[in-house]
Amino acid sequence: MIFGKAINRYYLKHAPVLLLGILSLLTVDYIQLLIPELYRLVINGANLGQVVVDGQTLPFTREVLFQHICLPMIWIVVLMVIGRFLWRVCFFGSAVSVAADLRERMFDHSRRLSQQYYQVNKVGNLMSLYTNDLDTIQECFGDGILMFFDAAVLGIMALVKMWRMDCKLTLLALIPAAVMFVLGTVMSQVMTRRWEERQQAFSDLSDFAQENFSGIAVIKAFVKELKELIAFRRLNKENEEVNVAYTKIATLLEVLVTLFVESVICVILGYGGWLVWRGQFNAGQLVEYIGYFEAIVWPIMAISMLIEKTSRGKASLNRITELLDAPIDVADRDGVADLRDPHGGIEFRHLTFRYPDGEYDVLKDVSFTIKPGESVGIVGKTGAGKTALVDLLLRTYNVPDGTLFVDGQDVNAVSIHSVRDACAYVPQDNFLFSDTIAHNIGFGVDDASQADIDRAAALADVRDNIVDFKDGYETVLGERGVTVSGGQKQRISIARALLKNAPILILDDSVSAVDTRTEKIILDNLKTSRAGKTTLLIAHRISTVEQLDKIVFIEDGRVEAVGPHDELYRSCAEYRRMVDLQKLEDEEGGGSHG
């Protein structure tokens, strides 16, 4: 059995079912210990020609054999089958339910964690929590309760019967048990550490494989297959070594338990045989005594298995608890209200921001205003802080009080859900789900109609590409959309955002993978379809945003200029230098980009 704040609640939640299982287990254990008495009757009846039943000496006849031995044995077997089926359903059914509920808690908590958590913790490590560690918890919960009560109850009842038959023989048999208990306690601590190392090694291996499969195109392009194979072999070797180390400890424990069992059998046969020779035991009683010991062999073995499972369970529970205890850094404050009827007004007011693990401010005293319905371009060099503005607007990170307002309300005074719901977002990394194109476009809108999906695809200039596919909108994309081109992937992401028709549309460098003609079509469609709604378009190229209502030019985290393209070109030297440089690059490159 394992205990911890992440799992203790389930013992209470499933208490009625677990108590029924324990009651069934106790019943099975009790009637199981009636079998050695039947052994004694058979042996003594065969040797002496008579048996003692309930204090009466009876001749060993067919009637006595059937009535007092065979018939009781049939009932014992029937009751044991029913009881074992019942406790299996109770214990293992509860364990499955616990794993399912714990998995849901983990997923619910994971989705509320900030972006910072996922930058530190890799996908492979997280996935191992949902697979290996949860499976271990499920196994420990069901088997752990079974082994604990079975070992305790069956072991105690069998020992009581053995003690009543001969206390000296029982004391001799218990000496190896005491040694085994001490060794098991010490070894359980070692096994817990070894299991934690094993799980971490598996997580590292899983994460490495996941990254390689996701980036297989890059690996092939740079001809690094052999290098990655060598790195995988190294991690696989480390995983093998920690698995072997754990297996050695587990095997040693199993060998010690087997040695204990065999040594006790030697004691029973030696001393018990001597008692039979002296006439203090008859052959039937010795067989009965051995039958009781056989009944506690399973509890003895269960102790070994319980130590191993508990060690693994503690390690896995610690890893899962770390996830469940991970702080939710970005969360609603008490008493926040929803952002009602948003119009798309945005104001940054003297905002300075540094990422939680950052060493310097990525935004410095940023101030500018976007009126509802304006189309605004945000431009600057790579690393200037453009994406940081989006991160804060979407409340991906915590925003300093009094520095960011939506429709005149401090974003910290309104719910995160309502702020994000007022926005449609196309990130730099255009993520697509491994699902149909229709599902990907309609992801942001519940029950989106096919007509709406088709219209959004047309606005993103991707409809013609989609209908050319064999299955059209029902084409299933590969993982992360790898079955479509970069430009198609980008335009499907734009269609998904346009379908939401949110008051605020944010496109973060979202037309970089399309040609100039397609870019112009998309921008023209945005202008007509987004009339009266706020649009933020982050871009590296000035030509992408020069026709927008105004442009915010950012340099080294500071807003250097805000205004229409022509005004910035006249008044801002750095902006003018960037425009001229990009024009020169276009002329040298034939005027194309993407």
Predicted regions and their residues:
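Juxtamembrane loop-to-helix connectors within ABC transporter transmembrane domains
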Residues: I2-F3, F91-F92, R111-I156
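Conserved catalytic Walker-motif region of ABC-type ATPase nucleotide-binding domains
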Residues: S110, F232, I320, F348-H350
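ABC-type nucleotide-binding domain
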Residues: L339-G594
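Helix-loop junctions and hydrophobic alpha-helical segments within the transmembrane domains
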Residues: M106, S110, I219, I320, ...
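Transmembrane helices of ABC transporter permease
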Residues: K13, V17-D29, I76, D143-E197, ...
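Membrane-integrated ABC transporters
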Residues: M1-I35, N47-P72, L86-F91, A95, ...
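An intracellular "coupling" helix at the cytosolic face of ABC transporter transmembrane type-1 domains
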Residues: L12-K13, Q115-Q116, N132-F141, I145, ...
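Helix-loop-helix
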Residues: K161-I175, A245, I249-N318, L324
